């Protein structure tokens, strides 16, 4: 009560904002006469003047009145459209990073041109986000004329585009595209192996059209890129045959004397750390056996750069055969390996070991080796759009979700008044007892409208409902057209004509969004066809266009006299916003119109939330069959039911976000590190830091910090350094010969020895040549471990709710365990990279180049890449890879199963390497 009184006294926050904006509108209007006098060239020159002022430090806020005035004047000349004052208000809200709620037909597309123009002056790029490719293409071409006139460049970002075209689209001042494509490009940019292959710039400013659809309806499902890593089935089988030929060593050798081995062998097992290590004899045996099998050339070393992956497979096979035992660590069930939880003894169906171990166990047991389908990258729309420095959006219906926009995105909603007050008559809902009665009443209403020539739009909540009404109208002999939100371009044409006299159009709620329904029909296509007809002279063109417009004006008046567009809906959507969108398609720009919802007690929303209450009212009133109840109390109880559903859906989205925020913080760290690696000219500092950290960890296992000599296990340390890192250091001798030595000095000696061993490899081929190899090793390790980490987070997320039964907070437990998993990921990358760089045997620069290429190519050879994105209802939908990973998705017609190496000559005959030619498109 008190808040209502204060609002009346001081005005709402919305009123105060609009009052502030109207002062600026007055300034813009005052400039109009001055700008009307400018020539086209002088008006265009204003852009260069503004860009100079921004470069010198003037803020965009200060430029706003002049830039908006220039944008409006240019629109009058190029588009033959003048921005209304309310469109200026909407544009200001967008520039200030708010959501602009403008009713359908108020010209949102034109409104956006002003803040887009203003923000593009900064040179950092503006992204306009639409719900489908058709609208992105249409708006970019339509509004692009205005931007080009003002000297700005426009790009369209579509799927299937080659990389160079995408880069050009993002480099433009203004880029149009869909939410899915922007998100997928961001993920793909964080999977590239060369900085020059990235397509996006820094994310500066985005205006999201139909912001409620994108940031709310589609926010329940994340964008996911998944695929199968390169198929190594043959390699796992081959390695499984090598393992029985290697013999386990019994007893541990003293690094100084070599004594202690009771039976020499090829590998040792460390039960404590669950690891297997090859002995020197084992390396020789393995090399001999692998050469005999044709897996490596005669006389080659396992530590050659080109054989790094062989070591990985050999160790996986050794661990599978000697550390993982059937019916203890796993069981074989229906031809699959199922992991056994070591703590509970339960079977963990669906989970797989990483690092190739699962495939190695499959090879050991002789079951089918499954190429693992992994999540390669994923992000939710909430987290993607929060990466922009400034975000804003526009829609016809945001006010019902204003709380969510503020809570999740920090976006305030500003309700912009219509240019002309609405004359639409929103009639009370009619509720029937049964579905049959509801449909009969709706068809009767449609028939009456059709007989008098009034156009009707029938809105449905699903394709299934559309088909029911389609069938009923066919039986009633009423001509109509059906739209089901699939062919966006055809949709727009049908929706544009839905306002013609006598038209009946059935549409699902989402179909044809972004296209206005003009009373009397839309004649712009016919006008454009006449203008493009080269066989007609100018006078004939003008005469025909004038006749068309005259006919349209008569049709328009006729439809207005009949009551405008009639909206008939046969079900309430679970969101009030979607119902309001449907209503908003009628009564645009002050046109007449009407809407009515026909409901039954059998409708799912009524049945679940409001049915009992309304049924009780009907029974109390003793309503006969076929009679409807039409009362404010019923409509209010339905809206209250919708509010309950909206609140539940908000909680689902909020919970998804709370869990994804954990992964998001980690994603930012990984992607930032990845980008730094890609851009760095010198990685020696990063590598040195990793090496020092690894060697410190290993030293501290055997020589604890601030410990005395009696607590040291120098023999164990020497062995670990030699086995795992190939650092041979006579620490025991040095300690015995030294007067006094501290644990810190031991650590210094080990780090110095590691640095020297590493530097010797760099000196052999030169820092330049070693840089590319280091970078490939780092990126490959980051990527493969990040993929495994995403799978681990998925598994953790699936079972975390069970912690609630143990009186623990699932979200807190998830955060804690996800952090621990992330710490393990960083340690794993550190150890993996350091081990490879310390143990690799370098012979020549060319060999190192080949190894780097092989690593990059292995990382990029991911088969069956699929893209999962939300549909317009928020349900997940799997899309094929628009680029088709590997050869064949690049315009080359290759026989099935043929793959081209990155360094092979391109089959197109250009003479270039495949990676520099058609491989770029793959």
Curated annotation (Swiss-Prot):
Cofactor(s) listed in the protein's UniProt record: Zn(2+)
GO cellular component: cell envelope Sec protein transport complex; cytosol; plasma membrane
Location, primary (coarse class): membrane
Domain of life according to the entry: Bacteria
PROSITE patterns cross-referenced by the UniProt entry: SECA, SECA_MOTOR_DEAD
Protein encoded by which gene: secA
Cofactor binding note from Swiss-Prot or TrEMBL: May bind 1 zinc ion per subunit.
InterPro entries: Helicase_ATP-bd, Helicase_C-like, P-loop_NTPase, SEC_C_motif, SecA, SecA_CS, SecA_DEAD, SecA_motor_DEAD
Membrane topology label: Peripheral membrane protein
Listed EC numbers: 7.4.2.8
Family: Belongs to the SecA family.
Chain segments carrying region Disordered: 867-912
Record's protein name: Protein translocase subunit SecA
Assembly behavior: Monomer and homodimer. Part of the essential Sec protein translocation apparatus which comprises SecA, SecYEG and auxiliary proteins SecDF-YajC and YidC.
HAMAP family: SecA
Species of origin: Paracidovorax citrulli (strain AAC00-1)
Listed GO MF terms: ATP binding; metal ion binding; protein-exporting ATPase activity
């Amino acid at each position: 009560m008190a808040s209502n009184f204060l609002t009346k006294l001081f005005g709402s926050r919305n009123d105060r904002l609009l009052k502030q904006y109207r002062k600026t509108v007055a300034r813009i209007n005052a400039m109009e006469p001055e700008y009307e006098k400018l020539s086209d060239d002088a008006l265009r020159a204003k852009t260069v003047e503004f860009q100079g002022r921004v470069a010198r430090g003037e803020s965009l806020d200060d430029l706003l009145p002049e830039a908006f005035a220039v944008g409006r004047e240019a629109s009058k000349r190029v588009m033959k459209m003048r921005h209304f004052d309310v469109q200026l208000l909407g544009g200001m809200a967008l520039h200030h990073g708010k959501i602009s709620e403008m009713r359908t037909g108020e010209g949102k597309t034109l409104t956006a041109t002003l803040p887009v123009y203003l923000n593009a002056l900064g040179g950092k790029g503006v992204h306009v986000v639409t719900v489908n490719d058709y609208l992105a293409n249409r708006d970019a071409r339509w509004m692009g004329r205005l931007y080009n006139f003002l000297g700005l460049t426009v790009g369209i970002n579509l799927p299937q585009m080659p990389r160079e075209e995408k880069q050009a689209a993002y480099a433009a001042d203004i880029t149009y595209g869909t939410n899915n494509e922007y998100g997928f490009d961001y993920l793909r940019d964080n999977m590239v192996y060369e900085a020059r292959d990235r397509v996006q710039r820094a994310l500066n400013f985005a205006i999201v059209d139909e912001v409620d659809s994108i940031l709310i309806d589609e926010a329940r499902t994340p964008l996911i890129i998944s695929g199968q890593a390169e198929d190594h089935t043959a390699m796992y089988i081959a390695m499984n045959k090598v393992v029985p030929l290697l013999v386990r060593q019994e007893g541990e050798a003293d690094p100084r004397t070599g004594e202690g081995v009771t039976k020499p062998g090829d590998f040792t097992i460390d039960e404590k750390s669950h690891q297997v290590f090859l002995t020197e004899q084992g390396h020789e045996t393995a090399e001999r056996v692998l050469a005999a099998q044709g897996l490596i050339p005669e006389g080659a070393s396992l530590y050659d750069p080109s054989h790094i992956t062989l070591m990985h497979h050999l160790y996986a096979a050794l661990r599978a055969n000697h550390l993982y035992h059937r019916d203890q660590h796993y069981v074989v069930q229906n031809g699959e390996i199922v992991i056994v939880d070591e703590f509970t003894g339960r079977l963990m169906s669906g989970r797989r070991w990483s690092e190739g171990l699962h495939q190695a166990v499959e090879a050991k047991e002789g079951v089918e080796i499954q190429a693992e389908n992994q999540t390669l990258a994923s992000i939710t729309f909430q987290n993607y759009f929060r990466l922009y420095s400034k975000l804003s959006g526009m829609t016809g219906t945001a006010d019902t979700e204003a709380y969510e926009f503020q809570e999740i995105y920090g976006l305030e909603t500003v309700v912009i008044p219509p240019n002309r007050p609405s004359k639409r008559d929103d009639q009370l809902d009619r509720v029937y007892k049964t579905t049959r009665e509801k449909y009969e009443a709706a068809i009767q209403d449609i028939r009456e409208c059709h007989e008098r020539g009034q156009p009707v739009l029938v809105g449905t909540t699903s394709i299934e409902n559309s088909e029911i009404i389609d069938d009923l109208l066919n039986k009633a002999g009423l001509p109509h057209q059906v739209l089901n939100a699939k062919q966006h371009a055809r949709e727009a044409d049908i929706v544009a004509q839905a306002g013609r006299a006598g038209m009946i159009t059935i549409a699902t709620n989402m179909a044809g969004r972004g296209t206005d329904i003009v009373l009397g029909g839309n004649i712009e296509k016919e006008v454009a066809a006449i203008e493009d007809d080269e066989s007609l002279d100018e006078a004939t063109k003008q005469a025909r266009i004038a006749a068309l417009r005259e006919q349209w004006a008569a049709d328009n008046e006729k439809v207005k006299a009949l009551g405008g567009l009639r909206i008939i809906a046969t079900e309430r959507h679970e969101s009030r916003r979607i119902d309001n969108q449907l209503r908003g398609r009628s009564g645009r720009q002050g046109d007449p119109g009407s809407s009515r919802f026909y409901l039954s007690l059998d409708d799912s929303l009524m049945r679940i939330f409001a049915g009992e209450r309304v049924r009780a009212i009907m029974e109390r009133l003793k309503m006969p069959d076929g009679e409807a109840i039409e009362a404010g109390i019923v409509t209010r109880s339905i809206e209250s039911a919708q509010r309950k559903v909206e609140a539940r859906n908000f909680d689902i989205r909020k919970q998804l976000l709370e869990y994804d925020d954990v992964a998001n913080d980690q994603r930012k760290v990984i992607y930032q590190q990845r980008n730094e690696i890609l851009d760095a000219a010198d990685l020696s500092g990063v590598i040195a830091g990793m090496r020092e950290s690894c060697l410190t960890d290993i030293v501290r296992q055997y020589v604890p910090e601030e410990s005395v000599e009696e607590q040291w296990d120098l023999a164990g340390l020497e062995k670990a350094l030699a086995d795992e890192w190939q650092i041979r250091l006579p620490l025991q001798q040095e300690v015995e010969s030294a007067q006094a030595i501290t644990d810190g000095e031991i650590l210094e000696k080990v780090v110095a020895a590691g640095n020297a061993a590493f530097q010797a490899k760099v000196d052999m081929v030169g820092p330049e040549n070693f840089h590319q190899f280091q970078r490939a090793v780092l990126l490959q390790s980051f990527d493969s471990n990040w993929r495994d980490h995403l799978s681990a987070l998925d598994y953790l997320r699936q079972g975390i709710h069970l912690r609630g039964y143990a009186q623990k907070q699932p979200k807190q437990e998830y955060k804690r365990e996800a952090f621990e998993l992330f710490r393990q990921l960083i340690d794993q990358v550190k150890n993996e990279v350091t081990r490879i760089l310390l143990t690799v045997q370098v012979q020549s620069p060319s060999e190192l180049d080949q190894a780097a290429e092989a690593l990059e190519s292995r990382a990029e050879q991911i088969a069956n890449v699929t893209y999962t994105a939300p549909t317009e209802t928020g349900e997940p939908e799997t899309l094929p890879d628009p680029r088709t990973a590997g050869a064949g998705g690049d315009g080359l017609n290759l026989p099935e199963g043929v793959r081209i190496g990155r360094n092979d000559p391109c089959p197109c005959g250009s003479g270039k390497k495949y990676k520099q030619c058609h491989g770029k498109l793959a």
